[in-house]
Amino acid sequence: MTERIVEPKPHEDDLPVENSLRPRRLDEYVGQQTVKENLAVFIEAARQRAEPLDHVLFHGFPGLGKTSLATVISNELGVNMRSTSGPVIERAGDLAAILTNLEQGDVLFIDEIHRLNHVVEEILYPAMEDFQLDIIIGQGPSARTIKLDLPPFTLVGATTRAGLLSPPLRDRFGVTLRLEFYKVDELKLIVTRSARILGIRVDAEGALEIAKRSRGTPRIANRLLRRVRDYAEVRADGRITREVADLALRMLDVDEKGFDGMDRKILSTIIEKYDGGPVGIETLSAAVSEERDTLEDVYEPYLIQEGFLNKTPRGRLATRLAYEHLGISVRSCRQLKIY
């Protein structure tokens, strides 16, 4: 599958820009008000007690700011942050090397923490609970375990699949926070802030047009901003207005709901070829020439979240919103009864 402009996971060229756009403090962070309020209390309490912050788990869809919040936590506490990810830590020794190099109060950020293998995960248990590292010396009957003290630290984990975390690991996080999709007005503020940092000229209506099509996700908003900037510099006077943003996003095949061509193809296939559904996932996969896992993990979540697709035991159903968005009338009483 080629990279989509509205893909919430990072593209390779996103990362350098994202690092420059990340907020450094809580008061710079836009959106996630409940999460921010909770963190402000927990961070201040940790400061007053001169203790490390309890271990924190962030979960939610990709691109909502989990890494940015980990950065904010380390900056607010005035400590260093060490970043890694679940798939990178292949052996227990890899994790042991990271843990033994931490300093008092440091933040260890593990992205995609649900992808840690079980052997590595078990090393984390005593490290999180007792700030100790169990090291096995020798093999066979002569093997023995020694305990190595670690400096107190804060583990910040991030996951898009909280249900895949084992209960023992999940229970060791003192703070668990879910990140929600952003509102349009919050995304407008993010677009405006990013434009200022990147030196992009955008007016209020132009920022709003980009925000509307960003699928509730800051990462997508920032990516669309950069692509619209390209269009504005080549086809306009370099300033992003509502009209320029609309023309650029149409050229990129991103409609007013933030759907791309494949999103619309999935909905139109269900409606036009299968009378609105229900249609099985394997049949739909063959009809749109896309792998089942890709449909379930990449395309369906947002369509379901926005109410354009229903997932039932009998298959997928297009909702009335899907008909209206595509400009297709509901063509039978059977379809009307579904909703």
From Swiss-Prot:
Its main location: cytoplasm. It is an enzyme of class 3 (hydrolase). Residues 1-20 are annotated as: Disordered. Keywords: ATP-binding, Cytoplasm, DNA damage, DNA recombination, DNA repair, DNA-binding, Hydrolase, Nucleotide-binding. It catalyses: ATP + H2O = ADP + phosphate + H(+). CDD domains: AAA. One of its GO terms (molecular function) is ATP hydrolysis activity. Its EC number is 3.6.4.-. It is found in: Cytoplasm. It comes from the Bacteria. GO terms for cellular component: cytoplasm; Holliday junction resolvase complex. Residues 1-14 have a biased composition (Basic and acidic residues). ATP binds at L21, R22, G63, K66, T67, S68, E129, D130, F131, R172, Y182, R219. DNA binds at R292, K311, R316. The keyword Signal does not apply. Residues 256-339 are annotated as: Head domain (RuvB-H). The keyword Nucleotide-binding applies. GO terms for biological process: DNA recombination; DNA repair. Residues 183-253 are annotated as: Small ATPAse domain (RuvB-S). Belongs to the RuvB family. NCBIfam families: PRK00080.1, ruvB. HAMAP family: DNA_HJ_migration_RuvB. Homohexamer. Forms an RuvA(8)-RuvB(12)-Holliday junction (HJ) complex. HJ DNA is sandwiched between 2 RuvA tetramers; dsDNA enters through RuvA and exits via RuvB. An RuvB hexamer assembles on each DNA strand where it exits the tetramer. Each RuvB hexamer is contacted by two RuvA subunits (via domain III) on 2 adjacent RuvB subunits; this complex drives branch migration. In the full resolvosome a probable DNA-RuvA(4)-RuvB(12)-RuvC(2) complex forms which resolves the HJ. Has 3 domains, the large (RuvB-L) and small ATPase (RuvB-S) domains and the C-terminal head (RuvB-H) domain. The head domain binds DNA, while the ATPase domains jointly bind ATP, ADP or are empty depending on the state of the subunit in the translocation cycle. During a single DNA translocation step the structure of each domain remains the same, but their relative positions change. The RuvA-RuvB-RuvC complex processes Holliday junction (HJ) DNA during genetic recombination and DNA repair, while the RuvA-RuvB complex plays an important role in the rescue of blocked DNA replication forks via replication fork reversal (RFR). RuvA specifically binds to HJ cruciform DNA, conferring on it an open structure. The RuvB hexamer acts as an ATP-dependent pump, pulling dsDNA into and through the RuvAB complex. RuvB forms 2 homohexamers on either side of HJ DNA bound by 1 or 2 RuvA tetramers; 4 subunits per hexamer contact DNA at a time. This is Holliday junction branch migration complex subunit RuvB. The lineage of its organism: Bacteria, Pseudomonadati, Thermodesulfobacteriota, Syntrophobacteria, Syntrophobacterales. The gene is ruvB.
